[in-house]
Amino acid sequence: MCGIVGILGREPVAEQLVDSLKRLEYRGYDSAGVATLEGRHLERRRAEGKLKNLEKRLEAEPLKGTTGIGHTRWATHGKPTVNNAHPHATERVAVVHNGIIENFRELREELEKNGTVFHTETDTEIVLHLVDDLLTRGNKPVEAVKLALARLRGAFALGFIFAGDNDLMIGARNGPPLAIGYGDGEMYLGSDAIALGPFTDTISYLEDGDWVVLTRNSATIFDKDGHAVQREKIKHAASTSLVDKANYRHFMAKEIHEQPEVVGHTLARYVDMATERVSLPVKLPFDFKNIQRINITACGTASYAGFVAKYWFERFARLPVEVDVASEFRYREAPLRKGDLAIFISQSGETADTLAALRYAKAEGVHTVAVVNVPTSTIARESETVLPTLAGPEIGVASTKAFTCQLMVLANLAIAAGKARGELSDEDETKLVHGLVEIPRLMSDALTTELQIEKLAREIAKSRDVLYLGRGTSFPLALEGALKLKEISYIHAEGYAAGELKHGPIALIDETMPVVVIAPYDRVFEKTVSNMQEVAARGGKIILMTDAKGAEEATVESLVTIVMPDMAAAFTPMVYAVPVQLLAYHTAVIMGTDVDQPRNLAKSVTVE
């Protein structure tokens, strides 16, 4: 969602603010702006669209202040215009905001009755005028912000600077993340560690309800009750190289090609190569023998990783698994048995719905495990157990390497569960671990299909609709493939269990419809072939992703057959994810879309 940065510096900060905002581009945005203290007065520069437009504004009208805040906006209230872009400001105060103010209507009506004139369509302007009104009434900045925060309902991260005070910045968090960066005679505020990477290696994360008063030499943190508190200082290593595309055209391409390496790193964290056994990086605070049911909760691509894991837990450990979309789970008051297990999957570790679901599960007394890519994130900090993925920062909005690393973690956890429950023998475990050890090499092999897929993408780019089909663990991958294609190419796509074809989707099949069939040769392959025959009979254009045996046994002519390496049937989603991602990527490139920052999407969804 929106990105926030603030700097109390010793040199002019406008250029630093923009550089930091570039590191937050992955979150998604449609406008951007900065505000600095010029002498005793606040000055803003804002622009619609990409940061290069803001840079042009700053070239034409430079800012020289050493105190400033910056923002990338992802529109929620109000259209993506310059007028609605942050920072918002009066003569006395400037503010940046990530989140949603839920009681903005009643606060706006109250302020308008008192004579306040609003100039934007945003809920953020309510915060601005609340603080400005309190300043007008004689309150000092710290007291004004404290009183204003008490009036707000919703999810928000806020940053404030004030006219006439070059050594003051205030931040507040209620939901979306906000970090403090500690420098030498300088202090920083940012949405995450990546934003602050060029400036400092020492940060603290505010907790929900916290607010902080920053000067160049101090950070005074208060909790929601107004008590001064200490928050742990964390060392991080978010260097500038982390957001470099190297020789790739897009971050997404780079991240697809990084998968053999990062999945290998994740594998090495979870498997003892010497003994060929699963070796989790943490001791679980529960015994799988006592678990009767697992609930897996996530959003988007992460939920499809959870869906794949459902098959693994049920097969390896004979444990029933329920997979929930977090935005539904958090409100349906699902009955959870105390002592059972809930797994929460999130790349950022800040997904608002997943975090709310986690808090519900904790209140119900179940064990909680977080599978996250950011071990210092809120979901990680609030979970009983953290199982990190080692994907490294993922900048492209459409998840690729985080997804496959999540699968690697979940596969190991499912094997550990099966072993603990006596459902897997030592021999079974060794066989499965052998299959996992082969995954990085097989992913490298899968990348060799890229030229074939690039040609295929020209055909897909002509289509209005695309259907993805799969059975077993290939069904969630079909859902993921459809999501990837529509996310970045804007072509409508749907994923279905192949057996559901005749229960509705078959009505869509005609000569213009590409149908991507994900079908490694396994015990349900023949069933999938029968579905392919149904597609062929109606003129559909079949794109088959299978192995050599499947290509040989398929009795239906395909437009294209993408032959994948032979591998352990249980873990095909990790390897078949590669051509699925490449197909979406190259189709989007042909369509000319913004691959890394597709329209209307945000990387880290920190509000509902």
UniProtKB/Swiss-Prot annotation:
The keyword Transcription does not apply. InterPro entries: GATase_2_dom, GFAT, GFAT_N, GlmS/AgaS_SIS, GlmS/FrlB_SIS, Ntn_hydrolases_N, SIS_dom, SIS_dom_sf. The lineage of its organism: Bacteria, Pseudomonadati, Pseudomonadota, Alphaproteobacteria, Hyphomicrobiales. Keywords: Aminotransferase, Cytoplasm, Glutamine amidotransferase, Repeat, Transferase. It is found in: Cytoplasm. This is Glutamine--fructose-6-phosphate aminotransferase [isomerizing]. The active site is at 2 (nucleophile), 603 (for fru-6p isomerization activity). The keyword Cytoplasm applies. Residues 2-217 form the Glutamine amidotransferase type-2 domain. The gene is glmS.
